[in-house]
Amino acid sequence: MAGEEEAVSNKQVIFKDYVSGFPKESDMFLTTTSINLKVPEGSKAVLVKNLYLSCDPYMRGRMSNLPPEDPNFSSFQPGSPIQGFAVAKVVDSGHPDFKKGELVWGVMGWEEYSLVTAPDQRLFKIYHTDVPLSYYTGLLGMPGITAYFGLTDICSPKEGERVYVSAASGAVGQLVGQFAKLMGCYVVGSAGSQEKVELLKDKFGFDEAFNYKEEHDWNAALKRYFPEGIDIYYENVGGKMLDAVLLNMRPHGRIAACGMISQYNLQQPEGVHNLTSIIYKRVKIEGFVSFDYFSQYSKFLDFVVPSIREGKITYVEDIAQGIENAPAALVGLFSGRNVGKQVVAIAHE
């Protein structure tokens, strides 16, 4: 930390104000400030240069004016940088566990440089660099943890069971399907375009897939793909899709409630009408968030890293270039514009 402080410009994506309905690019704006490339003397903070920013559906919730119930889901602060998962390189450190030049992933501001004041709570070191660094925004980061533990811990899949994944081509869904296939399950996914449907079958190895936008009766579609019913539903959509799934669950089926992207931008969320199916089919539904499992990150890596190296898992990313394109990339999630995990590359290592 010794030496003369060096100040550099720092582009930031600022959150303008709380959002109602679909987010727009104009709900964010770009500004440039300056930042010293040294952590404050005596501080245990870590200063990082951000390389990749992660765009994730949960961020829409943080754009709303939320009650302060859960610090993991607090609102973004108007006038401050958007916060999200990112991959970064340590520029300077006052913390004994983080050294200059090391690569990390965790929660950062949407900016070129971030000062992380609680690195032991917010940062994970990157040890495996024989894969694309951007994977730590997805496959090897929060979405991967979400996919793996939502499937294994909540749903406990058994060989031969029938698994349905909604929003299946997204950051989490594409992994759930592949993990379930590795565990010997029959897997069907739904997505919003023919391109994504083909991706599910040809790239990710799903047994079947369908375009939900071309199906006028989702109950009938699910009966077609699951004539004997669904054992496991990995829930990413909510609303009418959840209603249709409940009619098609098998006795003692399990539902991991990961997200409900169809509801995030509605002024009035849709109700669910087929809840009695939960009772007479003895269906288990459990909600969870990725933070619940961060302490088990090493267990996840033990499973997924060998699978990547052996070519058993593949991952598709949609990478936008430049921090100035980050607002459009985030907003595009909610119209299905992305194909695969949405990432923004803002610097090279």
Spell out what each predicted region is.
Residues 97-98, 157, 249:
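Short, well-ordered loop/turn sites that connect or cap secondary structure elements
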Residues 107-123, 296:
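A structural motif shared across PLP-dependent enzymes of the aminotransferase-like
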Residues 237-313, 347-349:
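Glycine-rich phosphate-binding loop and adjacent beta-alpha segment
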Residues 2-10, 310-319, 327-349:
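C-terminal capping/lid region of NAD(P)-dependent oxidoreductase domains
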Residues 181-244, 267-269, 291:
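Adenosine-nucleotide cofactor-binding segment
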Residues 36-55, 63-110:
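Glycine-rich beta-strand-centered segment in the early N-terminal region that forms part
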